[in-house]
Regions:
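Active-site beta->alpha loop and helix N-cap motifs at the rims of alpha/beta catalytic domains
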Residues: 1-49, 55-62, 209
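Short, functionally important structural connectors and interaction interfaces within domains
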Residues: 3, 19-20, 96, 119, ...
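Non-cysteine beta-strand/loop elements that form the S-adenosyl-L-methionine
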Residues: 6-15, 75-88, 145-149
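Catalytic beta/alpha-barrel core
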Residues: 7-10, 26-31, 82-84, 101-102, ...
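Generic structural signal for helix capping and beta-alpha/helix-loop junctions
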Residues: 16-17, 90-91, 131, 152
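Glycine-rich tight-turn/loop motif centered on a GG-T
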Residues: 16-33, 63-64, 92-105, 165-167
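Alpha/beta catalytic cores of nucleotide-metabolism and tRNA/nucleoside-modifying enzymes
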Residues: 36-39, 44-46, 57-71, 75-80, ...
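Active-site-proximal beta-alpha loop/turn segments in soluble metabolic enzymes
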Residues: 51-62, 86-98
């Protein structure tokens, strides 16, 4: 009804809150249940169903476990799999720790691809620069970026040239800021101002002399002054355009 292009089942999150609900990475313990979920999700054959998973559970690598998991879920007929190429450790490590403490193993993704060449496997995990993303994209079906974009939204400004040999004239305009504030305005007062504005905070990444703007923003966030915050962001964009073209 909402006309989505794709529905993704995420069985890669290791948080305790998620585990209490019996979903997330702990579902990898029951590959048949995951397969049944994917079956049920494909009621509308016009919408692609995919899955995002880890390569295993616990501290030790186990390719047999990973392979058997993929074997089972592919029986559902899905052909798009996003893989965070780390194990998920369900106890003793925070979700943040689970994003960097378990070692990466890209070889598992390459190996399963050789078994299922007709399935699209998208690599995720540890891709902390666009240069690394470009290199890995040539070795795999594709790459998925997460924290890199959150930490530095402007990392994508040159993606068309790097990946597709196309020129672009990328710029964040005042309209972008206005549209975003219009989007979050109805939620102001009922949701955390830090949560609402966090997607914008990293537009300062790597921009010279941005410290004064950050100080003003954090001050106004403490005062919950929504309108002044919008003006600060707009002034920043107007003054710093030269640095984010």
């Amino acid at each position: 009804e909402l006309n989505y292009d794709e529905i993704n089942l995420n069985v890669g999150c290791p948080s305790k809150a998620v585990q209490k609900g019996s979903f997330g990475a702990c579902l990898m313990k029951d590959k048949t249940l995951v397969k049944n979920c994917l079956d049920a999700m494909q009621i509308n054959r016009d919408i692609e169903v995919s899955i995002k998973c880890r390569i295993g559970l616990g501290k030790n690598f186990n390719y047999e476990f990973f392979e058997e998991f993929i074997d089972e879920i592919l029986k559902s007929g899905i052909r798009l799999v996003y893989i965070h190429a780390r194990n998920a450790i369900l106890n003793g490590i925070s979700p943040k720790g689970n994003r960097n403490i378990p070692p990466l193993n890209y070889n598992f993704v390459s190996k399963i691809k050789s078994k299922y060449p007709y399935v699209t496997f998208i690599l995720n995990g540890g891709i902390n620069s666009m240069d690394k993303a470009l290199k890995l994209s040539k070795l795999h079906d594709g790459v998925m970026l997460g924290r890199l974009i959150q930490n530095n939204p402007f990392c994508l400004k040159d993606v068309d040239r790097q990946f597709y040999n196309q020129t672009n004239n990328y710029i964040i305009s005042e309209k972008t800021i206005i549209d975003y504030f219009n989007f979050i305005r109805p939620k102001f007062g009922t949701d955390s101002i830090y949560r609402l504005l966090s997607p914008l905070l990293n537009i300062f990444f790597g921009v010279p002399n941005a410290k004064e703007f950050k100080i003003d923003i954090h001050s106004m966030m403490k005062e919950n002054n929504f309108e002044i915050l919008e003006k600060i962001f707009l002034n920043f964009i107007k003054e710093k355009k030269i640095f984010i073209n």
